[in-house]
Amino acid sequence: MTSTGKDGGGAQHAQYVGPYRLEKTLGKGQTGLVKLGIHCVTCQKVAIKIVNREKLSESVLMKVEREIAILKLIEHPHVLKLHDVYENKKYLYLVLEHVSGGELFDYLVKKGRLTPKEARKFFRQIISALDFCHSHSICHRDLKPENLLLDERNNIRIADFGMASLQVGDSLLETSCGSPHYACPEVIRGEKYDGRKADVWSCGVILFALLVGALPFDDDNLRQLLEKVKRGVFHMPHFIPPDCQSLLRGMIEVDAARRLTLEHIQKHIWYIGGKNEPEPEQPIPRKVQIRSLPSLEDIDPDVLDSMHSLGCFRDRNKLLQDLLSEEENQEKMIYFLLLDRKERYPSHEDEDLPPRNEIDPPRKRVDSPMLNRHGKRRPERKSMEVLSVTDGGSPVPARRAIEMAQHGQRSRSISGASSGLSTSPLSSPRVTPHPSPRGSPLPTPKGTPVHTPKESPAGTPNPTPPSSPSVGGVPWRTRLNSIKNSFLGSPRFHRRKLQVPTPEEMSNLTPESSPELAKKSWFGNFINLEKEEQIFVVIKDKPLSSIKADIVHAFLSIPSLSHSVISQTSFRAEYKATGGPAVFQKPVKFQVDITYTEGGEAQKENGIYSVTFTLLSGPSRRFKRVVETIQAQLLSTHDQPSAQHLSDTTNCMEVMTGRLSKCGTPLSNFFDVIKQLFSDEKNGQAAQAPSTPAKRSAHGPLGDSAAAGPGGDTEYPMGKDMAKMGPPAARREQP
């Protein structure tokens, strides 16, 4: 990795992997840290996954190599692309496609359950990409909304092929992996299984989640959850279209032999859709000419290494025998697919490199001398047209640059074993900025991460490498976590709260100061959540004490809403629906501020006040409905609720002041007391706040029951079998 900067105070540093400048941290996965990379010339954005070779076991590194080989096999518009691979002795860098829309999981949390039309769009794209993978004998085995990303146009990208496997012919898979919420019964039971059938089950669970906003199988107790999955009994909500219900039952089928195939799914009436909808995506043809390989010298070494890392071709002698066979077979098809990818996208040394001055910089994993289609070896590409620098940062003549390259500065490492001492990818000596083609230095964008390496006593930089994604440095603990994660996958990812890292966490290059990022998957921070959502309500001819009392009145009349007082004119509230699963239900947190619009302080008894509602976190749609309910009470011409409303909202309450100590006291008197408290506070008297009511009304302005949230949706019972639940009566279709 290269670090460039300017001497003197306020120096800015930039870390590079090849031509890509590293910026903010996007997330932390199971095997490495993921950072945003920007090309120093084209400004292309990529996601760079940094894998620490020294802190991961050999089996985990083999999984990373297998993921690289699988991503080379797949070229599909709805599969995340692998651009390049860089490496040095200590680190491996995967340069992946960057998408800005975030995870489908976060989209579902923010928007709630989707309309059948939007769900069909996403589902078609998932099936199209999965069909392409299966046609190349690749099974994903870890499909879930967290691993489905969205680009800027809300199109799907399937990501994270770390659990993927190559299933050749009629062979079956044995490894139990994935998340238990999306895993099929045969995987849960530990039986041999067909990876293609397992992916179909996972797609059925995902489709159910898109349409319902909840999972068909859910339980806080893992043992109970696994039993539910093995039984395969789930509740089918009434609002799902009948055609889609039959599709879901065919995909979420316990008997793998009766489970629908991708071919049947693509012919299903719901998948095809109506006349006014676009046609389903057609399969992408990919024809590769399979020819005979006369001898071992005709076999490309890079392709052979990639096939060996796939896992199912570990017997190298048998693989070579199959490749040299005159008959067409699966091995030859995969070989020529990888060879075709290598010939169409050759990996050569970079030419647009920034200045670098390191002992062991990241080197691009380039192609070895390979055979062309005519059986002749291509000359090895030796491009040395890159500006080199001395220790002081001055340019080096071209001849000396070539000499430095001959001493290992730009070795073509294929296996990853490179000479020289290990250097952290996150620190290196200062050098001058690399000039752009026009002669001016490249501007450093605002917000570029700054990292200043500490000086050792000898005056050499002390590298601070990123910590390993594994827990601790104990080998047995690493192995234990690997075994656990291989089966459970990410069982809590579907329950995690959407966390936005602080600016310090985003700019820091080491994950030690970013513990919250470890809870997110690789690409969980692609989506931009910095935009604030505010709603303003203007109130005239009401004193401040009355407005504050009305706000508290509205808070207490909404079931499952709690609040706290921040200051004289500010409140913080949280709406959290009770009785439903926490899968896609996120609490709404917001702040309420009261400001006087005609002066600095509210000194007048009556005037014009502005009440500002600011969304802090949670679904915006539910936030708007909560605010609409509060706004209706604030703008009401009557200070007191109607008699009918009072009869519906009468509760047993106690107030700390002792003014209300008997059950059955009307709520109107209760809020008169609140107004009096605020009035006393304004006059300088010590006010005592009433305690929270011990019981909330079962009827409120948001719905017919406490279980109905601002969205008007009846929540599913938590921890109860979905099969025992009757059809939701209060749930209504989305607009």
Swiss-Prot record:
- Give its localization: Cytoplasm, Cytoskeleton, Microtubule organizing center, Centrosome; Cytoplasm, Perinuclear region; Endoplasmic reticulum
Chain residue ranges for the region called Disordered: 346-476, 492-516, 682-735
Q: Summarize what gene deletion causes.
A: No visible phenotype. Mice are fertile and healthy. In contrast, mice lacking both Brsk1 and Brsk2 show little spontaneous movement and are only weakly responsive to tactile stimulation: they die within 2 hours of birth. Defects are due to impaired neuronal differentiation and polarity.
Q: According to the UniProt record, what class of enzyme is this?
A: transferase
Q: Which PROSITE patterns match?
A: PROTEIN_KINASE_ATP (PS00107), PROTEIN_KINASE_DOM (PS50011), PROTEIN_KINASE_ST (PS00108)
Q: Which UniProt keywords apply?
A: Apoptosis, ATP-binding, Cell cycle, Cell division, Cytoplasm, Cytoskeleton, Endoplasmic reticulum, Exocytosis, Kinase, Magnesium, Metal-binding, Mitosis, Neurogenesis, Nucleotide-binding, Phosphoprotein, Serine/threonine-protein kinase, Transferase, Ubl conjugation
Tissues/organs with expression: Detected in pancreas islets and in brain (at protein level). Detected in brain and pancreas.
Q: Which GO terms describe its molecular function?
A: ATP binding; ATPase binding; magnesium ion binding; protein kinase binding; protein serine kinase activity; protein serine/threonine kinase activity; tau-protein kinase activity
Required cofactor(s): Mg(2+)
**Can you tell me which residues bind ATP?**
26-34, 49
Identify the residues that the record assigns to the Protein kinase domain, covering every copy.
Answer: 20-271
Single GO biological process annotation from the record: neuron projection morphogenesis
Q: Which residues carry this modification: Phosphoserine?
A: 295, 368, 383, 394, 413, 424, 428, 456, 513-514, 521
Post-translational modification here is noted as: May be phosphorylated at Thr-261 by PKA. Phosphorylated at Thr-175 by STK11/LKB1 in complex with STE20-related adapter-alpha (STRADA) pseudo kinase and CAB39. Not phosphorylated at Thr-175 by CaMKK2. In contrast, it is phosphorylated and activated by CaMKK1. May be inactivated via dephosphorylation of Thr-175 by PP2C. Polyubiquitinated by the APC complex in conjunction with FZR1, leading to its proteasomal degradation. Targeted for proteasomal degradation by interaction with COPS5. BRSK2 levels change during the cell cycle. BRSK2 levels are low at the G1/S boundary and gradually increase as cells progress into G2 phase. BRSK2 levels decrease rapidly at the end of mitosis.
Keyword Nucleotide-binding on entry: yes
Activity regulation behaviour: Activated by phosphorylation on Thr-175 by STK11/LKB1.
* Motif KEN box: chain residues: 604-606
Phosphothreonine found at: 175, 261, 460, 464, 510
- Taxonomically, the superkingdom here is Eukaryota
Residue ranges with Basic and acidic residues bias: 346-367
EC code: 2.7.11.1, 2.7.11.26
PANTHER family annotated for this entry? BR SERINE_THREONINE KINASE 1, MAP/MICROTUBULE AFFINITY-REGULATING KINASE
Q: How does it assemble?
A: Interacts with FZR1, a regulatory subunit of the APC ubiquitin ligase complex. Interacts with COPS5. Interacts with PAK1.
Main function: Serine/threonine-protein kinase that plays a key role in polarization of neurons and axonogenesis, cell cycle progress and insulin secretion. Phosphorylates CDK16, CDC25C, MAPT/TAU, PAK1 and WEE1. Following phosphorylation and activation by STK11/LKB1, acts as a key regulator of polarization of cortical neurons, probably by mediating phosphorylation of microtubule-associated proteins such as MAPT/TAU at 'Thr-504' and 'Ser-554'.
For this chain, the family text in UniProt reads: Belongs to the protein kinase superfamily. CAMK Ser/Thr protein kinase family. SNF1 subfamily.
Recorded protein name is: Serine/threonine-protein kinase BRSK2
Name of the gene this protein is made from? Brsk2
